[in-house]
């Protein structure tokens, strides 16, 4: 049976991990969201999140976005290539409702799966 957890090993934890992804990423974007990816040498994908106070002033709004992103990653992790992913929230992300945000994330994950198959 497949475990759909989001343990510590599936997270980008240090600034070095984030810096690695930001150096030469593959990108998939919408106006509200960008997912950056870079292949890693591990047997699983990892996720990092950046949601700036500049775009979402209230902590509960930032937490909602991060919670939905983590949940989307958790459910898609076995389809995803072995890459380090960083989700960058942009201006206007707070206007998306939960369903729209989830659909947007699913579309971006599919785009990264296709990008990984091409390379």
Swiss-Prot record:
Quaternary structure and partners: Consists of a catalytic RNA component (M1 or rnpB) and a protein subunit.
InterPro entries: Ribosomal_Su5_D2-typ_SF, Ribsml_uS5_D2-typ_fold_subgr, RNase_P
Reactions catalysed, as given in the entry: Endonucleolytic cleavage of RNA, removing 5'-extranucleotides from tRNA precursor
EC number: 3.1.26.5
Family: Belongs to the RnpA family.
Name this polypeptide is given: Ribonuclease P protein component
Origin species: Pasteurella multocida (strain Pm70)
GO BP term, example: tRNA 5'-leader removal
Keyword Nuclease: yes
GO-annotated molecular function: 3'-tRNA processing endoribonuclease activity; ribonuclease P activity; tRNA binding
PANTHER family, sorted: RIBONUCLEASE P PROTEIN COMPONENT
GO cellular component: ribonuclease P complex
Keywords, in A-Z order: Endonuclease, Hydrolase, Nuclease, RNA-binding, tRNA processing
Function: RNaseP catalyzes the removal of the 5'-leader sequence from pre-tRNA to produce the mature 5'-terminus. It can also cleave other RNA substrates such as 4.5S RNA. The protein component plays an auxiliary but essential role in vivo by binding to the 5'-leader sequence and broadening the substrate specificity of the ribozyme.
